[in-house]
Amino acid sequence: MWRLPRALCVHAAKTSKLSGPWSRPAAFMSTLLINQPQYAWLKELGLREENEGVYNGSWGGRGEVITTYCPANNEPIARVRQASVADYEETVKKAREAWKIWADIPAPKRGEIVRQIGDALREKIQVLGSLVSLEMGKILVEGVGEVQEYVDICDYAVGLSRMIGGPILPSERSGHALIEQWNPVGLVGIITAFNFPVAVYGWNNAIAMICGNVCLWKGAPTTSLISVAVTKIIAKVLEDNKLPGAICSLTCGGADIGTAMAKDERVNLLSFTGSTQVGKQVGLMVQERFGRSLLELGGNNAIIAFEDADLSLVVPSALFAAVGTAGQRCTTARRLFIHESIHDEVVNRLKKAYAQIRVGNPWDPNVLYGPLHTKQAVSMFLGAVEEAKKEGGTVVYGGKVMDRPGNYVEPTIVTGLGHDASIAHTETFAPILYVFKFKNEEEVFAWNNEVKQGLSSSIFTKDLGRIFRWLGPKGSDCGIVNVNIPTSGAEIGGAFGGEKHTGGGRESGSDAWKQYMRRSTCTINYSKDLPLAQGIKFQ
């Protein structure tokens, strides 16, 4: 994920007005978007000029008031009052009390509550997706799709609520049963990043809930309105079912709240999505108290196109993986390795495809490419482009800031770098694609694996043997290993996460539910004898 200067803040809330030829008069800038007629739909989500950013059964907040901005024009949307440390303490206590009620509810009935949450999200999918587009900056279809991911994981969790459980194992002693018992860990803290302000919370929240846990969420400060809106939807479901709202608590805040969560022994599992740099600090703080952490950190993902690749698949896949969400996905393709025999043709096709990308306001349904999330991200983009040039790279497409309001940069292609160039080994959260030539399978598999991160990877080939070598022990060392599809766009049915400096955590489908539970091995003697294990006699 995107590197940040302040630990656990995930990214800082913007406070200054946009400078430049498109600056608006102060009187206009003082008008929040939520008060303008074209944004009246925000109030359908229960939002207003100033919103309370703490929920633990009731709404409140005694911390700093921040303003969130629209990345497409850098105009203020609305304000959110963040949590103070005292708010955090109160919320944790209420969440722990709520757990005593929630843990006693049978898992299938917990699944019914999660089903209702999914249905409530369905009802608000368009308006909530529009808020994601407005506050985060991703295009509308991606904003709606992100809410759909939360809906989908709710559906998945409902089914899982009737299936979670451990096996009965054969005992070596007659008259004995050996059972694996799974119980909820208790309180799950969830710290999410700006780039997926709905879906990542959903992956964690839905599964954690059916496992019998309560959740405490700290979203990114710059997407605080999304955190508030989602929590309002969930809170209504809980309140309608006469359940404690603190089952799904919210504490909007920055580094102080994130640090408190990481150090708090009452937080039994902390799920953190963010940069590798900050994730290391989180991991150390949690490990120092022997807690559990689920880390989903950086990705420096590669696509490999072999000489037998279907170029009608390679080009659109590389395009979507590199510029989707303006290069701000953790699964964004940042490195493209092309066999030397097809390198020039693929680069030329990519340049033509890049020239056809429709740029504009992200909530316009015809737009495919929106802004970066903050002005800081624009600066990081420019710094990376200059560093690539210094290291011998050639910008063959893009490389500049767009002359328009908002945080828009040109999607960029860089060729000519060495595979081991330091900038190519640095995750820059921006739409920059580094393109390399390779000669053979052995070297390119090694190049894929030589970066510190290990999230997502993909090859394009028709060679069945090569596919299985790619999937095997000497192939990709990533958590997501694809064939003939992009590096981005994971489905909820599979466990999501990566290896090495990506953190090793897994969210969403498969058996990721086990991370939200603790396992006990239970031996039950239902005989009248007392045989010891391994045939030991102790008389």
UniProtKB/Swiss-Prot annotation:
Residues 1-26 form a transit peptide. SUPFAM superfamilies: ALDH-like. The record marks N195 as: Transition state stabilizer. CDD domains: ALDH_F7_AASADH. The modification N6-succinyllysine is found at K94, K537. Pathway: Amine and polyamine biosynthesis; betaine biosynthesis via choline pathway; betaine from betaine aldehyde: step 1/1. GO terms for biological process: aldehyde metabolic process; choline catabolic process; glycine betaine biosynthetic process from choline; sensory perception of sound. One of its GO terms (molecular function) is L-aminoadipate-semialdehyde dehydrogenase activity. The active site is at E296, C330. NAD(+) binds at T192, A193, F194, K218, G258, T259, G274, S275, E296, L297, E427. Changing E427Q: In EPEO4; loss of alpha-AASA dehydrogenase activity. Coiled coil: none annotated. One of its GO terms (cellular component) is mitochondrion. Keywords: Acetylation, Cytoplasm, Disease variant, Epilepsy, Mitochondrion, NAD, Nucleus, Oxidoreductase, Transit peptide. Belongs to the aldehyde dehydrogenase family. Multifunctional enzyme mediating important protective effects. Metabolizes betaine aldehyde to betaine, an important cellular osmolyte and methyl donor. Protects cells from oxidative stress by metabolizing a number of lipid peroxidation-derived aldehydes. Involved in lysine catabolism. Homotetramer. This is Alpha-aminoadipic semialdehyde dehydrogenase. It comes from Homo sapiens.
